[in-house]
UniProtKB/Swiss-Prot annotation:
Cross-link (Glycyl lysine isopeptide (Lys-Gly) (interchain with G-Cter in ubiquitin)) at residue(s): 688
Motif PDZ-binding: chain residues: 1480-1482
Region (Disordered R region) location: 654-832
Function, in words: Epithelial ion channel that plays an important role in the regulation of epithelial ion and water transport and fluid homeostasis. Mediates the transport of chloride ions across the cell membrane. Possesses an intrinsic ATPase activity and utilizes ATP to gate its channel; the passive flow of anions through the channel is gated by cycles of ATP binding and hydrolysis by the ATP-binding domains. The ion channel is also permeable to HCO(3)(-); selectivity depends on the extracellular chloride concentration.
Glycosylated residues, chain numbering: 895, 901
InterPro entries named in the record: AAA+_ATPase, ABC1_TM_dom, ABC1_TM_sf, ABC_transporter-like_ATP-bd, ABC_transporter-like_CS, ABC_transporter_C-like, CFTR/ABCC7, CFTR1_ATP-bd_dom1
Gene Ontology terms for molecular function: ABC-type transporter activity; ATP binding; ATP hydrolysis activity; bicarbonate transmembrane transporter activity; chloride channel activity; chloride channel inhibitor activity; chloride transmembrane transporter activity; intracellularly ATP-gated chloride channel activity
Residues covered by the ABC transporter domain: 423-646, 1212-1445
Name of this protein: Cystic fibrosis transmembrane conductance regulator
Bilayer disposition of the protein: Multi-pass membrane protein
GO biological process, one term: bicarbonate transport
Protein's cellular compartments: Apical cell membrane; Early endosome membrane; Cell membrane; Recycling endosome membrane
Domain note: Binds and hydrolyzes ATP via the two cytoplasmic ABC transporter nucleotide-binding domains. The two ATP-binding domains interact with each other, forming a head-to-tail dimer. Normal ATPase activity requires interaction between the two domains. The first ABC transporter nucleotide-binding domain has no ATPase activity by itself.
Amino acid sequence: MQRSPLEKASVISKLFFSWTRPILRKGYRQRLELSDIYQIPSADSADNLSEKLEREWDRELASKKNPKLINALRRCFFWRFTFYGIILYLGEVTKAVQPLLLGRIIASYDPDNKVERSIAIYLAVGLCLLFVVRTLLLHPAIFGLHHIGMQMRIAMFSLIYKKTLKLSSRVLDKISIGQLVSLLSNNLNKFDEGLALAHFVWIAPLQVTLLMGLLWDLLQASAFSGLGVLIILACFQAGFGRMMMKYRDQRAGKINERLVITSEMIENIQSVKAYCWEEALEKMIENFRQSELRLTRKAAYVRYFNSSAFFFSGFFVVFLSVLPYALIKGIILRKIFTTISFCIVLRMAVTRQFPWAVQTWYDSLGAINKIQDFLQKQEYKSLEYNLTTTDVVMETVTAFWEERFGELFEKAKQNNNNRKISNVDNSLFFSNFSLLGTPVLKDINFKIERGQLLAVAGSTGAGKTSLLMMIMGELEPSEGKIKHSGRISFCSQFSWIMPGTIKENIIFGVCYDEYRYRSVIKACQLVEDISKFAEKDNTVLGEGGITLSGGQRARISLARAVYKDADLYLLDSPFGYLDVLTEKEIFESCVCKLMANKTRILVTSKMEHLKKADKILILHEGSSYFYGTFSELQNLRPDFSSKLMGYDSFDQFSAERRNSIITETLRRFSLEGDAAHSWNETKKQSFKQTGEFGEKRKNSILNPINSLRRISITQKTPLPMNGIDEDSGETLERRLSLVPDCEQGEGILPRSNLINTGPTLQRGRRQSVLNLMTHSSGNQGQNIHRRTTAFTRKMSLAPQANLVEMDIYSRRLSQDSGLEISEEINEEDLKECFLDDVESIPAVTTWNTYLRYITVHKRLIFVLIWCFVVFLIEVAASLVLLCLLSKVSPEDKGNTTKSANDSSAVIITSTSSFYFLYIYVGVADTFLALGLFRGLPLVHTLITVSKILHHKMLHSVLQAPMSTLNTLKAGGILNRFSKDIAILDDLLPLTIFDFIQLLLIVIGAVAVVSILKPYIFLATVPVIVAFVLLRAYFLHTSQQLKQLESEARSPIFTHLVTSLKGLWTLRAFGRQPYFEALFHKALNLHTANWFLYLSTLRWFQMRIEMIFVIFFIAVTFISILTTGEGEGTVGIILTLAMNIMSTLQWAVNSSIDVDSLMRSVSRVFKFVDIPTEENKPTKSIKLPKDGQLSKVMIIENQHVKKDDIWPSGGQMTVKDLTAKYIDGGNAILENISFSISPGQRVGLLGRTGSGKSTLLSAFLRLLNTKGEIQIDGVSWDSITLQEWRKAFGVIPQKVFIFSGTFRKNLDPYGQWSDQEIWKVADEVGLRSVIEQFPGKLDFVLVDGGYVLSHGHKQLMCLARSVLSKAKILLLDEPSAHLDPITYQIIRRTLKQAFADCTVILCEHRIEAMLECQRFLVIEENKVRQYDSIQRLLSEKSLFRQAISPSDRVKLFPHQNSGKHKSRSKITALKEETEEEVQDTRL
């Protein structure tokens, strides 16, 4: 980043913002890069501002019982805020004085007042000087206030982030990620946007008092009639505002519903295509869109009339102010023109400035109170550790995630009674529901010595992770004692990858040691994976490691934990995503050898791990079921396997599991109603974290945090994002960032939002932060590439071949300090940081975009013609009236008037007061009627255009190939449907209308003035040219700066979400200061862009004012020097001159706004033009032997079942299959060829990242593929894409549950009857689950079905496959993180419901793979082996290495029996006995 010219700029350069000229010049000539942005002033750095505010806040906390954040802010910023307020007031005072001088100039041309003619020149000079002073006062004051607002936002951003890292886990469970993002964006944005208006809360009343005094002097008591009109108008606008709020509140719910489904569709687009649900979801989203648009139109009409009322209120104010005076004393020209000028200023103060100021203070104080409440929440308390101890001891420890569970039950029950919910199933309330808080851990005792391995096992929800959290201090024990040294390293169950390189993720701020680092990556089996990357371990991992496989992410997380030199290592199920062979090698080489001298606590369910552990702790429902050695376990608890793993009846699961379902159901159904939203909560302890539920608790989706294939943050945000205050009465309209404020104008010149809303609505609707941390398999992140400082690398004296056998921790480094990041972020890092965020959109919207937008709907062209014709009528009427009245002799003085309202601003003279009044009323009423209704058709049609574009974009995305969608960010796609569509719905119609109206007003006024004084036309032309050239010059740079600012905004929220997901890891490693410094870097980067944008904007506004001053000087002196007698002509010219230039300035700003908003249209068009999947057959169709074409071809998404349909057997032949993720990319699979017999079961084998899941996607034609696949003799090139995919039943690795009823999730097209659905639900074990909920099949699942466990969701996918009647079933890791109960149900269903189907299984559990007849071994993207299980075991193969001797002994009887009996059917597989289950897995 370059050094800012501001540091060496002179006072004059700072006053006129001339120091921004270099960046403006460069932006006009070429495309700006992040390296072109200037460094921020040191006073604006996040470190300095946060330290200053934190010091004052700490002082406030220490000195008072009720600390106030506003007091801390006052001590930091009050004096500068007051200074700029006084400057702003002086600038506004000049506006009140200008009409007085204008009146004196007009009066000097009165034939009866020739004495003052000599001082007209001096009065004109004074009037021009007032404009100069006003320009020099207002712009620095406004910029200074914006600057202070920016500094306040930065300081509070940092304070909130630091507080977030300190919050206790219990508090984090009560706060959703959407609330935190809302706190940082919607609330803090108010300081940036509104601080410049805050002073008008006292300036406006003073200005009104001054103006009314001057009007009293001018018109006496009749002046108050005009004020009364303004007050009535303000009340009228307030009524309109309430109507808009009403429609917005209703509309917000519709937007939320649409965006929930849209975000779920985008996040699970691969599953949508696999299920062939494109049409069903498109219809569902369009239905929500229709309801939304009805309310959008109503809100737009109200806003339009509200805006029109302001435009045309000038007529009423002037008319009613002058009418009483004119009827009594006649009309005086000087007083007419002076009154007009006074009323313009008065109208702005009463109807705009003061209401805006009040709203600003209301919003700002509300935001400060929310932040204040957040800053006082309970913090994480570090436990006191004994650094000299070497043992880990727990003595009768009991802990609660959340106490008083029964209170939630009683409250929900009372709410249900009050609401008289009749469809609540009484069986939902189990008799054994505890009225006391349920401990997550109770009476836990154990002791492990240094160097021992403790294996922790237990069923799902037994409290294994909670045990680790308690050791780390995240969960405070209510009873008992915990003793250890406090030097902990932690590996989470769900791998967490921070933005940065592979090496940075592993060393994680710890001092670098080459020997230790190489040992760790070798022990964690990362050497081969790292070697495949071009940049090796310097490869930047973005999106939480989205470019890595799940196994690679898990191994990097494990390597991070192992690399740190600690006394205690907590490993929470680190092998969940690893294949059997890799898991075995890592456990032996890393856990058992490399860490042999370290104390380890490993959460596992593998029998092999238990056998090698020094001690075993088995948990059951939070209690210690067993503690001791493995031999003691076998002797004392011979039934531990079946007892803990739940191989008894599925319907008789524990009361604790049932209570989990109840609690979540009550939370969703009773307390939060339709607004309750949450993410998938798959851990039992998350059900216990209920928190304090307010009846009006609203939740949100992340906006706009950009992501590559997963959604942040950002932005999905189906619900309005409120602050942390649960009981906030803030309206939905104010909270929902997707719905732009009618007056704020998101994305246009004066304002800026700090989050891509809508989406913005990035993810986390009501999921607590705690659940976010425990379900972070889809971590988000930006490609922030940070350079690390050089560290001293110690040379290893040991042979490299024996690295893993050395004790890598015996040579402790001199320091374990965090990684230094004190150097500046260099240009290369900045480019890489935003590589994925840069949009390929021109700096200025092209004419082609405007032309295409106009032609989207043919009616729009006719509407534009209508608007132009109406305007011509107005201008023609003004000119005709002017010509008629110009014949009236000016001798009839004393009766002068104004003939048009503010829209035409034409002033005429008449011969009598009554004649004047008739003309004035008649013409103004005509213009008023035309003006009020000429814009309605335009607004209506533009909303229709938005509807058409949304439909086209939705269809394009749903029909786009995955190869294209893989290159797009999910957050970017969601922003198109949220933020950009909101702009097309709300801002663009009225902004376009305002621009057209203002432009036509200027043209009309110039035409009128040119007729009166042709000389002025000569001055007008160069001024208009100057405006156009200045606009073009500024626009090139401003739009690029705006885009860079938007790109720099994303890392702030991405870093917040990333930090929250890895918060337990951060605390365990003590890296909070490191991440605070990174957060400040992201803030400083955004500040550099935003500060430069504000400065260049003020440069542009000031130049516009300067051109206006020059023009007004020219017009003033031309009119004075060339006009003889006649005060009317001078009044017309000077008044119109002021009106032309203020209107032209407004029109130029509106044109910039339109160009900025049209960028959203460009982005939408970009998605509309996405290529679609090739759905038509590319070959002639091969008819079946019976010659019936209907058996091969059916219409897509046919809702009528057909019994006799292809495929019939499930035979599958693959020939030379090659697959790529994107066009032109590397081949992921090469020359795959094999065949599968009907009803056969095939297992896919290979290391993590070898391409097993990719092969399943290739079967579904979700990738770019070459080669051929045939099913029952029918090639995939001879039938439609939809029909091909319908041949497969799919259970994906990532479960997809969209927001809707159970029935819709199982049967979105409505093909099956309730009896058939219940039958299938019974087969897969879902019936007992569905019957627990009110409404049963009609119960609405939200937020990915958070009330269901992960196993229940897998059963939903299984039920879909059964209903689809598919002959080929694809299963991708169906048992990953699956509880044993559900796993056994899936195995049973596969053997029964799919007995005659072909099954292709990708699985890491050995017992599931043993049931396959053949195995396909994939290695290095190619098929290495494809053979029977006997052949694979008889030779050296990957499968043989993965199978333990005990498994082989069990397997050979199956093989022997297979020689005598056909095993082509799954039902022929031998059922495993309970003993076999016990020996295989916990």
